């Protein structure tokens, strides 16, 4: 709704849906951060981290990293590659539900877009209040069918 040009791109070229799914995941990172314990001494960008130190990975910040994403504050369904860390950086802590989340989002857009003429807000968005999870609690919209 905030990017009608991007919606038009998807409707005109459904082959962009997989890219759009990744961009939505990057843009609307559902888990804000995770705390971990360093298992060994390491230096990261000049900062020493010792084994046993507590560290926090801010996924929402990493997904806007200007050294990784050109124009990171722009929503772009054509962004490719899209190396977001929405489901974690990989390894043993990678989100088990990542594949299902991608599948559900892809199917939603494959089924909705051909039937959608318009979508517009009809009231204020109510966001979840959490320091851990980022999401929408209530979002009233009006949908026009084709």
Locate each region found by the language model.
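Cytochrome P450
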Residues: 1-146
């Amino acid at each position: 709704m905030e990017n009608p040009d991007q919606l038009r791109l998807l409707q005109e070229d459904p082959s962009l849906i997989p890219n759009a799914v990744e961009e939505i995941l990057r843009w609307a990172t559902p888990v804000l951060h995770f705390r971990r314990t360093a298992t060994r001494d390491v230096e990261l960008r000049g900062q020493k981290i010792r084994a046993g130190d507590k560290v926090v990975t801010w996924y929402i910040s990493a997904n806007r990293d200007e050294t990784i994403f050109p124009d990171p504050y722009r929503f772009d369904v054509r962004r490719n590659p899209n190396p977001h860390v929405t489901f974690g950086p990989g390894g043993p802590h990678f989100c088990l539900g990542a594949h299902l989340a991608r599948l559900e989002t892809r199917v939603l857009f494959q089924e909705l877009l051909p039937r959608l003429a318009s979508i517009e807000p009809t009231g204020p968005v109510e966001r979840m209040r959490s320091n851990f999870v980022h999401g929408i609690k209530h979002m009233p919209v009006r949908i026009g069918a084709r």
